[in-house]
Amino acid sequence: MYGVCGCCGALRPRYKRLVDNIFPEDPEDGLVKTNMEKLTFYALSAPEKLDRIGAYLSERLIRDVGRHRYGYVCIAMEALDQLLMACHCQSINLFVESFLKMVAKLLESEKPNLQILGTNSFVKFANIEEDTPSYHRSYDFFVSRFSEMCHSSHDDLEIKTKIRMSGIKGLQGVVRKTVNDELQANIWDPQHMDKIVPSLLFNLQHVEEAESRSPSPLQAPEKEKESPAELAERCLRELLGRAAFGNIKNAIKPVLIHLDNHSLWEPKVFAIRCFKIIMYSIQPQHSHLVIQQLLGHLDANSRSAATVRAGIVEVLSEAAVIAATGSVGPTVLEMFNTLLRQLRLSIDYALTGSYDGAVSLGTKIIKEHEERMFQEAVIKTVGSFASTLPTYQRSEVILFIMSKVPRPSLHQAVDTGRTGENRNRLTQIMLLKSLLQVSTGFQCNNMMSALPSNFLDRLLSTALMEDAEIRLFVLEILISFIDRHGNRHKFSTISTLSDISVLKLKVDKCSRQDTVFMKKHSQQLYRHIYLSCKEETNVQKHYEALYGLLALISIELANEEVVVDLIRLVLAVQDVAQVNEENLPVYNRCALYALGAAYLNLISQLTTVPAFCQHIHEVIETRKKEAPYMLPEDVFVERPRLSQNLDGVVIELLFRQSKISEVLGGSGYNSDRLCLPYIPQLTDEDRLSKRRSIGETISLQVEVESRNSPEKEERVPAEEITYETLKKAIVDSVAVEEQERERRRQVVEKFQKAPFEEIAAHCGARASLLQSKLNQIFEITIRPPPSPSGTITAAYGQPQNHSIPVYEMKFPDLCVY
């Protein structure tokens, strides 16, 4: 019946007649607008017919596509677009199913124009806000197809660009349609993100190719507008901007995989650009999630090539700086812990030459210079991220890094690799470099907070090591902490300026907190400066650092007492060069003379005591004439001019402690303290600094002297402590502990299980025993004094002392006066 009615136009359903009337005889004439208005009015008047209209239009479109009647295909899609824009009723869901079916048909076509047409219609549909969204609608096909279009490799460059842009627009439409509706398909699922994100990155990756084309000035705006790279970046920003807390991981993981698969970490330019887009697009409070993803990826690639790891670290550096302005959350120490762990692994790789700890057949050989580059990248990242942290977090990071530095010891095991270097030494150097990066620019008004005791102790104990490079790092770290006004660069060159006002120093009055700090730690600092000056392996950089440290202490932390102590310290350094008990080379002795001259010249002008300045100036002028090798201008140059004989230096060339004490004492300084020579006190860490070879053995001998007989002192032979005696002592102590533990267990068990009467009887017996012992003690201690007249015999035949009162005693005449 329906088939017969279909043959006669008058008997066909009205919606079919209205649909047929919108198609002209010649497709070139386009859509019949008057008939389209009638169809739209009918659809609005009878919404229940909308799904049938869509089904019929879909049927016609599929037929026209099969017959290659592309003009009618375009008309059908235009009609569908207008119906979608006009209708917002509940029945539109069924109509949308037909619409999506037609769009899918166009996207399946091999004709680029039809693919672009279908994409444009889908984008229009995506921009429509539906009143009642459908949760059963699936967009899997569209995600796959649009992603495929993003990777188009058409021979024609212009057509390829159009197809790629259509694919990007389609993905953007899918995101807009689904991302904010929880009832619809979850676009954040990994199976969707693994297609969408790489497709966008693929087009971003070819931005250089697009920019390499140089269009004419008139065509430039059009080309710029049609760039797939810019459209992909805009789509990626929109996608990430809509990401919620739980979706960040699914959005970031495909980025990491894409960079791995296409080896994009090594040039690192594109990777940095990608993560800058990510960090600026996501919500600030989610930034720490991206950092966590990067840290995890760095750990996962711990055995990858050094260039790959360096690229990840560079990206991490850029991302962390951006994240620090938002919310880094609990990842601060986690980030530094990961970076320091990677630093240790890199040191092991460089020493062993492989990722497995030993070189074997088939093992990937590591390039040492690449590992060095990676280590420098890690250190740079540590510094750049730390510079963005607030003061309190930066202090925590400083303490955290210092806790990772291996402690120096007398017997530091040497673990050598191909280069024969000490693993602990390299670790110390790299961690101190990291600490220097973190401390650079660190400003804290309270030095007690900036340099707490536990941190300062560990840092200064490291300063006593034999390695010259480590000592230099420690000095630079101290300078970074103490310099709070940016004066350190003004002391980078050691000189004896006649007027220090040209340096334009920023000087503030010493605060109460600084005074407390110096009272507590000044002697510790002076001792390490003194011992550092005596090191034979010092070079020019060490003396420059020592001069800078002395100068900064004088400017930042000095009061009158500190100034006096610093002058005493420098005069003691002059004595080291003069007496030369350490057998220092000529250069070191000349350097110490020059260091003392430069510092005393500075401190004399800071104190502004005319007589003090005059004495220092006179000695410097005398040295210029008779001994220029004792001044920094001749010593701290590329080719030092030294004296071959420094013995017998005349007193006119030396700064005299008595003279300085006299002139400063007249200006209110403590002259008594100035007269005292500086002598450093040896501490445990100083004894620790006595470097000994690994093969050196220490024999511990314990001598016990018997002091029981004052007339004859008998020396007990020395007991040699061997491995067996130590083992026996440990075993015996363990046995004693076991016995004590068993006794306690029995006591507890007795009080828990024994009846009350038994416990009471036991306690009573102990009380009576205690009383008897006390009585015995009292009888011994409270005994009458002996009688001067002798003893008497008791009734039992035993001699008994008889007590005579003092007033009845008779004393010899010589004892009475």
Swiss-Prot record:
Keyword Lipoprotein set for record: yes
InterPro entries, per the entry: ARM-like (IPR011989), ARM-type_fold (IPR016024), EFR3-like_ARM (IPR049152), EFR3_Homologs (IPR051851)
Coiled-coil regions, chain positions: none
Keyword Ribosomal protein carried by entry: no
Gene3D superfamilies: Leucine-rich Repeat Variant
Membrane topology term: Lipid-anchor
Compartments where located: Cell membrane; Cytoplasm, Cytosol
One Pfam assignment: EFR3_ARM
PTM remark: Palmitoylated at its N-terminus, anchoring the protein to the plasma membrane.
Predominant localisation class: membrane
Superkingdom: Eukaryota
Record keywords: Cell membrane, Cytoplasm, Lipoprotein, Membrane, Palmitate, Phosphoprotein
One cellular component (GO) term of this entry: actin cytoskeleton
Modified-residue entries (Phosphoserine), positions: S212, S214, S216
GO biological process: phosphatidylinositol phosphate biosynthetic process; protein localization to plasma membrane; social behavior; transmission of nerve impulse
SUPFAM superfamilies reported for this sequence: ARM repeat (SSF48371)
Assembly behavior: Component of a phosphatidylinositol 4-kinase (PI4K) complex, composed of PI4KA, EFR3 (EFR3A or EFR3B), TTC7 (TTC7A or TTC7B) and HYCC (HYCC1 or HYCC2).
Function as written in the Swiss-Prot or TrEMBL entry: Component of a complex required to localize phosphatidylinositol 4-kinase (PI4K) to the plasma membrane. The complex acts as a regulator of phosphatidylinositol 4-phosphate (PtdIns(4)P) synthesis. In the complex, EFR3B probably acts as the membrane-anchoring component. Also involved in responsiveness to G-protein-coupled receptors; it is however unclear whether this role is direct or indirect.
Family the entry assigns: Belongs to the EFR3 family.
Name assigned to this protein: Protein EFR3 homolog B
Source lineage: Eukaryota, Metazoa, Chordata, Craniata, Vertebrata
